[in-house]
Amino acid sequence: MAGHSKWKNIQRRKNAQDAKRGKLFMKLAKEIYVAAKTGGGDPASNPALRLVIEKAKAANMPNENIERAIKKATGTQEHTNYEEVRYEGYGPGGVAVMVVCLTDNKNRTASNVRVAFSKNGGNLGETGCVSYLFDRKGLLVIAREGLDIDEDDMLLQAIEAGAEEMETTEDSFEIYTTPEAFEEVKEQLEKNGFTFASAEITMIPQTYTTLAGDDLKKMLKLIDTLEDDDDVQEVYHNLDESVLEE
C-alpha cells in the first residue's frame, strides 16, 4: 500500500461523480434501498444503512431523497428486487478490474459490462480471476488540514481503537481496519473527536499497474464507461493513478 494514496483515488472518483450528480444520487438511493430492505430502516440498528446514509450526505444528497429511498424499502408497496452481482476482468495492459453491480436484470447488466470491456481493450474473465489481487479493508480518511495532532499520536489512537495500520500522506491520515472492526474503530475515533473525509469498506489493490499512452486512455475510458452504467455501483482496479497527477 505504501506510496499509493487510496484517498487520492477516492477524490478523483468523487470529482468525476460530482459531474454526474443525478446519476450518483440514483445509485446512492439504490444502495440505501437495499440496505434498508435487508436490515431495516433504522440507521441506529443497521450499520450498513448508517454508513451509506453518511456517504450520501457527504455527496450532498438531499435528505428527502434519502428518506424516500428508506420509505420505499420499508413500505408496503411492491418492492424491486435488486441483486448484487460482481464481474472481474482485465483492462488494457493487464490492469485488474472488479465491477460491483446492483441490478434487477442480470442479463442486461452482464451484456453492458461485457461490451464496456470489449470496446475499451479489456477482457471480462471468470469469477475469481482478479479478486485475489485485492484485500477487503475498512478505510477511514482523516484530513490533516486544521488538525492539531502529529503522526505518532494519531497512529497510537488508531491502533488503540482497533485499526490494523495507518499511512500518512501530505493531506491525510489513512487508517485501515479489518471489515469486521470497521464500525468499532470508526465509532471510537468519532468519540475521540475526529471526523472523516471518507469512511468506507473497500477493495485495496495489493500491487499497482502503470500505464501510459493509448493503454492509459483506454483504461480511463473503460472506468468511465462502467461508472456511467446505471447498474454499476463500484469499479475497483489496480491502475496506478499517480501518473494522472503529473
Swiss-Prot record:
Main localization, broad class: cytoplasm
Localisation: Cytoplasm
Keywords: Cytoplasm, DNA-binding, Transcription, Transcription regulation
UniProt key word Transcription: yes
Keyword Membrane carried by entry: no
Pfam family, one: TACO1_YebC_N
GO molecular function: DNA binding
A single BP term in Gene Ontology: regulation of DNA-templated transcription
Family: Belongs to the TACO1 family.
Protein name per its UniProtKB record: Probable transcriptional regulatory protein GWCH70_2524
